């Protein structure tokens, strides 16, 4: 009975053991199979990594340049400097921010973005301007954020405040009308002070006397890409006097008589400034078809309303200090348009540099991704975006470069042109 019982138990469990051994063997087979597949793909991945290792290290396509507006054959090699380099020669330049104490958080955001993308390698000075004294919190926080020296200056009242010759009654009336009409910043007094200061007084501040170049930065902006070069060095080596990244149309209701004042200046200065054909005058007046687009606004004067967006600008301070530019500004300022209307510093700068500089002295930094609400710019080339670790999409709705609202194509046509591809990289 016991023997028969044992046989019975064996008979019951033998199929179970056999099944378990089968399952275990099958699982072991699958594990080994997947290990083999994983090993195969690991080896393949390693070969791909080694094949494109130079791309991973951001020396992308060393024999192809997708644009050469700023880093051309005789300025900078396209291959970027190794990020591990601990020393970079600096130009005689400063990063400049006009900012209020209340804008500290926005200032820190902009500083962090520019430090990460550019200045942590160069340690350029940061210069901060304000019409009231900076408080200790602002000074401590910005000093901590900067990789270079920080310095702070109080703008003299005579450089900031509304001049005494402005008719207060007319000014208040124009302020009320523009606010009622919904003009952007139409009712703001401080905004007018800022625009006039940026147009004709920022370069007169004594704290800037020892610098040759400035890089204007505003609070709450973003720099999307690593800078592949030092833009200050490009400015010096190529003899550039003004650099921009975005160009668009101005609101005509803010500058209804600006071009009238410019035309008076042109007549009075005809013998002392560049001939129209030698300057970028056509950029300001061309209203024809460019690509698929006519100007989005039909202007009421010969001025097509195109301007360089001055919240990002890199400039030669010695140009703005020149008698030619100061005469240009003072002629316009005497009209009172900064207060009776709402003239912005962007069209004033743009008209000034377009009339007083040759087109080849103005540079479009087309590799530098940037955003200032509501518009941005992003390199169109996928390879460039990879190389510069950009965090933007060239087809994003905020990117304005070749949209109907942009004047960039008009600059390509009437300014310094645009290069799209050059096959060979010459040595410098």
From Swiss-Prot:
Catalytic site: 313 (nucleophile)
Compartments reported by the entry: Golgi apparatus membrane
Keyword terms, alphabetized: Glycoprotein, Glycosyltransferase, Golgi apparatus, Membrane, Signal-anchor, Transferase, Transmembrane, Transmembrane helix
A GO BP annotation: protein N-linked glycosylation
The keyword Magnesium appears for this protein: no
Class of this enzyme: transferase
Region ranges (Stem region): 25-88
Region (Catalytic): 89-428
Glycosylation site positions: 77, 82, 92, 167, 414
InterPro entries tied to this protein: Glyco_trans_15 (IPR002685), Nucleotide-diphossugar_trans (IPR029044)
Annotated membrane topology: Single-pass type II membrane protein
Any single Pfam family the record assigns to this protein: Glyco_transf_15
Pathway of action: Protein modification; protein glycosylation
Other known facts: Present with 6400 molecules/cell in log phase SD medium.
The family this protein is said to belong to: Belongs to the glycosyltransferase 15 family.
Known role: Possible glycosyltransferase involved in N-linked glycosylation. Transfers an alpha-D-mannosyl residue from GDP-mannose into lipid-linked oligosaccharide, forming an alpha-(1->2)-D-mannosyl-D-mannose linkage.
This protein's name: Probable mannosyltransferase YUR1
Species: Saccharomyces cerevisiae (strain ATCC 204508 / S288c) (Baker's yeast)
């Amino acid at each position: 009975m016991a023997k028969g019982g044992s046989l019975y138990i064996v008979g019951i469990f033998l199929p179970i053991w056999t099944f378990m051994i089968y399952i275990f063997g099958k699982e072991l087979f699958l594990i080994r199979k997947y290990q083999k597949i994983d090993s195969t793909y690991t080896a393949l991945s390693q070969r791909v990594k080694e094949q494109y290792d130079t791309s991973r290290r951001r020396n992308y396509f060393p024999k192809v340049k997708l644009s050469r507006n700023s880093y051309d054959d005789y300025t900078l090699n396209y291959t970027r400097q190794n990020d591990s380099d601990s020393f970079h020669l600096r130009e005689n330049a400063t990063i400049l921010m006009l900012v209020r104490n209340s804008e500290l958080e926005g200032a820190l955001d902009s500083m962090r973005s520019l430090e990460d993308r550019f200045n942590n390698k160069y340690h350029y000075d940061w210069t901060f301007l304000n019409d009231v004294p900076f408080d200790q919190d602002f000074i401590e926080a910005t000093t901590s954020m900067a990789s270079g020296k920080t310095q702070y200056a109080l703008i003299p009242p005579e450089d900031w405040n509304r001049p005494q010759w402005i008719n207060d009654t007319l000014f208040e009336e124009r302020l009320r009308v523009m606010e009622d009409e919904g003009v952007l910043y139409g009712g703001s007094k401080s905004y007018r002070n800022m625009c006039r200061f940026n147009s004709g007084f920022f370069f007169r501040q004594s704290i800037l006397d020892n610098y040759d170049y400035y890089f204007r930065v505003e609070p709450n902006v973003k720099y999307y890409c690593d800078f592949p070069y030092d833009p200050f060095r490009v400015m010096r080596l190529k003899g550039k006097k003004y650099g921009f990244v975005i160009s668009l149309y101005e609101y005509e209701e803010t500058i209804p008589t600006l071009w009238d004042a410019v035309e008076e200046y042109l007549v009075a200065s005809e013998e002392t400034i560049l001939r129209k054909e030698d300057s970028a005058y056509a950029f300001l007046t061309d209203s024809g078809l460019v690509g698929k687009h006519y100007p989005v606004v039909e202007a009421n004067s010969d001025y097509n309303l195109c301007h360089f967006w001055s919240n990002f600008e890199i400039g030669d301070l010695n140009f703005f200090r020149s008698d030619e530019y100061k005469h240009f500004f003072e002629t316009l300022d005497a009209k009172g348009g900064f207060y009776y209307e709402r003239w912005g510093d962007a069209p004033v700068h743009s008209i000034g540099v377009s009339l007083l500089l040759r087109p080849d002295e103005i540079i479009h930094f087309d590799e530098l991704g940037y955003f200032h609400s509501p518009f941005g710019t992003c390199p169109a080339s996928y390879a460039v975006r990879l190389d510069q670790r950009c965090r933007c999409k060239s087809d994003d709705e905020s990117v304005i470069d070749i949209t109907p609202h942009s004047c960039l194509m008009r600059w390509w046509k009437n300014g310094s042109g645009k290069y799209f591809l050059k096959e060979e990289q010459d040595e410098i």
